[in-house]
Amino acid sequence: LKGKFIYYVGPVDPVGDEVVGPAGPTTATRMDKFTRQVLEATGLFGMIGKADRGPAAVEAIKDNKATYLMAVGGAAYLVSKAVREAEVVAFADLGMEAIYKFVVEDMPVSVAVDVNGTSIHATAPKIWQAKIGKIPVVDAAAG
């Protein structure tokens, strides 16, 4: 797994000529308690999921020079179009909970935690508030 990503996903069965059915991200926060162990044991480049990561996970990501990318929740069909190949590599009997190997191209993701441990969930709200505070409020009811 060295140099690869883990994508927290439960893909739906493909229909017709699809490689995989809708493949939206699952919440990564529930994996926080395993993040350090997984990164140190595997040499992963990073993880892909949705939602923010807790302080311990962010620290583990930083310490291992890894990254955490967010895929768009609610856009499972869009994400699935980036999957070029899909192969079940373990636990096929678990269906969508099996372990898959995906080959992806142009997957729509955003960097949520970079190799320096900078989390968009910590930095973005301050930036947004500063920008929103500069937007003039117009009372449409006042005419």
Residues covered by each model-derived region:
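C-terminal binding/interaction regions
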Residues: 81-143
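Feature captures the catalytic cores and cofactor-binding loops of soluble hydro-lyases/lyases
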Residues: 1-107
